Amino acid sequence: MSRFWSPLVHKLTPYVPGEQPKMTDLIKLNTNESPYGPSPRALEAIRAADNDTLRLYPDPEALALRKALGARIGLGPEYVFVGNGSDEVLAHAFQAFFAHGEPLLFPDVTYSFYKVYCGLYSLPFRNVPLTDDMQVNVADYAGPCSGVVVANPNAPTGIALDLADVRKLLELQPNRVVLIDEAYVDFGAESAVSLIKEYPNLLVVQTFSKSRALAGLRVGFAFGQPELIEGLVRIKDSFNSYPLDRLAQVGATAAVEDEAWLATSVQKVMASRTVLTEGLQKLGFDVLPSKANFVYTRHPNRNAAELATQLRERAIIVRHLRGERTAAWLRITVGTDQQCETLLSALRDILCSNSL
C-alpha cells in the first residue's frame, strides 16, 4: 500500500499468472504451453529479421500479419486486429465495448483475467454460474447487460460450445458485443470466425501462445466486422501505437503461413490428450471432455491441493485453482507422450502410497 497510489490502484486485485519456475529439470504442465516448440519457418523469419532494421519502429498497423491472418479465413485486413498477446486484445475490447452501465456477463468458472479487467475499468459484471456438470447454459445470458464474454473452449474446464450455441448467444444479445475467447480453439473446437460477416456484434479473440507455440513472442489477434476493429484501433492508438515489435510481426506472419506444421503439432497434442484422459480415468479420476490442450480433472477420494504438492515434490507442476467450485480440480497441460506417462506414473505411486 502507498499514499501515492490512486484510489483505483488501492482497489485492484491483479491477475496472478501461472508459475514460471526457474528450475529446468522438471515437467511443466501448469500454463498450457506447447511441448513442441514453434514453427521452424517462424524461427527462421525471426532470425532473418534480427538485423540493423531493429533501430526502426515497427509497422504500427502490422499490415502483413493482418493480411495473413485474414487470408486464412477469407477476410480482408480490415476485419483483423492484433495486439501484444490476447490479454492485451481482451483488455482493449473490455474498454472499447463494455462500458454501458449494465453488468457484463461471463461464467463463474472461467479465465480469471475477465474479472480483473472489470476492476481496472470499473465495469460492473455478473458471474453466470456454469451448470453442475460445468457447462455454459446459453439461455442464462439473456436479459439486460453490457455484453457477453465466453471462452470457447472454456478455461479451465476445456469444455466447448458448438456453433449453434454461439449463434444463440449472438441472437440473445443483438445490440451488445458478444466476445468469444478462442485461445484454445485449434485443439478440436468449432471456431466462430465463420459467423463474422453474419453478426456485427461478434468479436473473436485468438492467440499465438497455444497451438502455434509462440507464448514468448506475445501476439494475440481478433476478428470482427470493421466497426468493431476500428473501436479496438482507437483504444490501441490512445495507449500504444506500436504494440508488436518487428520480430513479433515477422515471426507471427511466418507461423500463420506454416499450416502444415500447425496441423501436425495440433494432432500430436490431441492424440496425447486422449491417452492422458484415458490414463487418468483408469486411476479413478473424473475428467471433463476437453477440446483444449489441457484436461480438467479431480479424484473423488483425494485432495487436489495435496496432489499438486505431491506432484511438485516429484518435479511435476500442474495448476490448482483455489475457489469454491475449482478447489477440487486440477488443470493439467497436455505434454509429450513421455511427459504424460511420467505424470500418470507419479500419480499411480501417489495414490498407492496414500492408500497404505
From Swiss-Prot:
It comes from the Bacteria. The modification N6-(pyridoxal phosphate)lysine is found at K210. The keyword Magnesium does not apply. InterPro entries: Aminotrans_II_pyridoxalP_BS, Aminotransferase_I/II_large, HisP_aminotrans, HistidinolP_aminotransfase, PyrdxlP-dep_Trfase, PyrdxlP-dep_Trfase_major, PyrdxlP-dep_Trfase_small. It is an enzyme of class 2 (transferase). One of its GO terms (molecular function) is pyridoxal phosphate binding. Disulfide bonds: none annotated. Its EC number is 2.6.1.9. Pathway: Amino-acid biosynthesis; L-histidine biosynthesis; L-histidine from 5-phospho-alpha-D-ribose 1-diphosphate: step 7/9. The keyword Transferase applies. Keywords: Amino-acid biosynthesis, Aminotransferase, Histidine biosynthesis, Pyridoxal phosphate, Transferase. GO terms for biological process: L-histidine biosynthetic process. It catalyses: L-histidinol phosphate + 2-oxoglutarate = 3-(imidazol-4-yl)-2-oxopropyl phosphate + L-glutamate. Its cofactor is pyridoxal 5'-phosphate. Homodimer. Belongs to the class-II pyridoxal-phosphate-dependent aminotransferase family. Histidinol-phosphate aminotransferase subfamily. PANTHER family: HISTIDINOL-PHOSPHATE AMINOTRANSFERASE, HISTIDINOL-PHOSPHATE AMINOTRANSFERASE 2. This is Histidinol-phosphate aminotransferase. The lineage of its organism: Bacteria, Pseudomonadati, Pseudomonadota, Alphaproteobacteria, Acetobacterales.
